[in-house]
A protein has these predicted regions:
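HIT superfamily nucleotide-processing domains
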Residues: 1-133
């Protein structure tokens, strides 16, 4: 069982921003920007997005699109960037990152520090927007 599966099952706490029967979205604990969110399939632990079956693959992207719409409404940004790396955690996941510039997607840059209170507030704002969709 991966750490992301444990998060989706509620065994490890997270800042949830969206959820449905098949997918879960939560704030990254080491974000590149305010609102940096990870989107995962709940029941598939493969670490390579292109190994997903067609239904899960399409569903994951549709869910990510809805979450990105909520992020854009809740977090001031020019757009929401997308990255699929799959290098650190062996569980398919999509990064949704609020951007002002292309440089905001630099995974090697110094990352901002957010307090637990700030993360909780951001997650609640995104979840509120998600629930409107």
């Amino acid at each position: 069982m991966t750490i992301f599966t444990k998060i989706a099952k509620g065994e490890i706490p997270s800042y949830k921003v969206a959820e449905n029967e098949e997918f879960y979205a939560f704030l990254d604990i080491n974000p590149l920007a305010k609102g940096h969110t990870l989107v995962i399939p709940k029941n598939v632990e493969d670490d390579y997005i292109f190994h997903l079956d067609e239904k899960t693959y399409e569903g994951l992207w549709a869910f990510a699109r809805k979450v990105a719409t909520a992020i854009k409404a809740a977090v001031p940004c020019q757009r929401v960037g997308v990255a699929v790396l799959g290098m650190e955690v062996p569980h398919t996941h999509i990064h949704l990152i609020p951007l002002q510039t292309e440089g905001d997607m630099d995974f090697k840059k110094k990352r901002p520090d957010f307090t637990p209170e700030q993360q909780a507030e951001t997650a609640a704002a995104i979840l509120k927007e998600y629930e409107k969709l």
